[in-house]
Amino acid sequence: MYRVLLAPGAKQELRNAIAYIKRKLRNPIAVARLADEAKTTLRNLRSMPERHPFCDDPVLRLQGYRHAPVTKYQFIFRITKTPNQVRVLHFFHETQDYLVTLQMESPGP
């Protein structure tokens, strides 16, 4: 079993996505669906984080970044084995270029 840690930035990005759908799109069904699927995905990361693929970018792949889909969004995370942790770093919409953000944060291979 893995311990799932949601970074403050990822929490805020998830909150922002929910607020956008609620206030701008005025779609309570989509809000509930996103919240439910996000919770389910985070819960599933506790037992099977390796089932999610590595990011497509070769540099990010070498650094162990993976992504887990949540409706039209995705959690970006890394797995550590000692201790068994999943660190969820970001929550991006599918249209966002997450590569730029992650490469700027990345310490290198």
Range-by-range predicted roles:
Residues 1-64, 107-109:
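Basic, Lys/Arg-enriched alpha-helical interface segments
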Residues 70-74, 78-109:
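Enriched for short, Lys/Arg-rich terminal
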